[in-house]
Design a protein with these regions (language model features):
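N-terminal alpha-helical interaction blocks
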Residues: 2-165
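Unchanged
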Residues: 105-161, 249, 254-323
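Short, intrinsically disordered, charge-biased short linear motifs at domain edges
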Residues: 172-180, 190-198
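Residues immediately within or flanking Cys/His clusters that coordinate Zn2+
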Residues: 183-186, 193, 204
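Basic (Lys/Arg-enriched) interaction patch that binds polyanionic ligands
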Residues: 191, 197, 209, 265-273
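Secondary-structure boundary elements
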Residues: 193-199, 229-234, 273-277
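N-terminal strand-loop-strand
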Residues: 201-251, 283-284, 306
Length: 323
């Protein structure tokens, strides 16, 4: 079966290249040390940028750092002038502007709140994300600059998938949200219960208990999603849940269980939800999915074609509204 599906949402992050060596100034460790110095530098207290269109350019106050604020899982964005429909662009701000915005909201900028996203050595820029969910007044503070926090799903839907730059921004925002939400749900050690602290610029966490020191890495939850078809390629099985908007349909999908292969998960989920028996399972592609529940912010969707062996549908009403 030939299908032109070459673009994957949240994939193709341009700043997630090979991790630089620790001695490289753009590595997480070196960049964090430089960040600490700048956090203590009073020259960061400059005037905020007045025009949102300049937020993606280098700032004279901290030309080698750009910060993307998030509030309750939503990235800071702006919509360009003259656009008939909202086309959201990431609201990057300088480190100096970030300090000013937070100070105006009574929030102390802490090292632990920042997460390293990546770098572009050619542009002499290191990118960070920060969770500002505790700043209740930040929405109006950024709103005065024509910036707003938008749900990542909304950004995804509004993104032009033929625009490589827009898709790259979507991938960066997805990576940032996944890391920040993982930090939010990993505040305590699962082994001893003590608090965890970020390490390597937020790439991992470690238990603060000196007798434990368990290292915790971002968890990835694998999900199978399958297009169930017949051998003649003239029938396809789609489903809908009660929470879907009208006329919205989806492929069957579900989480992989312990001790289960990807192919087994495809067959089990299809059978459990629709009563359809699946034979051959053919891999298609995969993509990150950082817009799931906050408790599982780092999902990986693995896509398959699944060839049906039976055709009598028996819908699980607890899972689906219909097929």
């Amino acid at each position: 079966m030939s299908t032109n599906l070459q673009t994957q949402a949240f994939a193709g992050n341009p700043i997630r290249s090979k991790t630089p060596k620790s001695t490289d100034p753009f590595s997480p460790t070196s960049a964090l040390e430089s960040l600490k110095t700048r956090l203590l530098d009073n020259t960061l207290h400059c005037q905020p940028q007045k025009h949102h269109s300049s937020l993606s350019s280098s700032s004279s106050s901290s030309p080698d750092f750009k910060v993307l604020p998030f509030r309750k899982g939503r990235p800071l964005t702006y919509s360009g002038p003259g656009e008939t429909a909202p086309v959201w662009h990431l609201g990057w701000i300088s480190l100096g502007d970030c300090k000013i915005f937070l100070a105006n909201s009574g929030i102390e900028l802490k090292e632990e709140a920042l997460v390293y996203l990546g770098s572009r050595s050619a542009d002499d820029v290191v990118y960070w994300a920060i969770d500002v969910s505790d700043g209740d007044s930040l929405a109006s503070e950024f709103g005065s600059k024509q910036l707003c926090f938008v749900e990542l799903r909304t950004v995804m839907v509004a993104t032009d998938w033929a625009d490589q730059r827009a898709m790259a921004d979507l991938a960066i925002a997805g990576h940032a949200r996944a890391l920040l939400e993982w930090h939010n749900v990993s505040r305590f050690c699962g082994h001893c219960g003590e608090k965890t602290i970020p390490k390597e610029a937020g790439k991992l966490k470690q238990c603060s208990n000196a007798s434990c020191k368990k290292r915790i890495y971002p968890r990835v939850d694998p999900v199978v999603i399958m297009l169930v078809i017949d051998r003649e390629n003239d029938r396809v099985l789609l489903s809908r849940q009660s929470r879907f908007v009208p006329r919205m349909w989806s492929c069957i999908a579900g989480f992989i269980e312990p001790g289960e292969s990807l192919e087994e998960a495809v067959r089990r989920e299809t059978w459990e939800e629709t009563g359809i028996e699946v034979g051959e399972v053919v891999y298609h592609t995969s993509q990150p999915w950082p817009v799931g529940p906050n408790s599982m912010p780092c999902q990986l969707m693995v896509g398959f074609y699944a060839y049906a062996k039976s055709f009598e549908i028996n819908v699980d009403k607890e899972e689906l509204e219909g097929t």
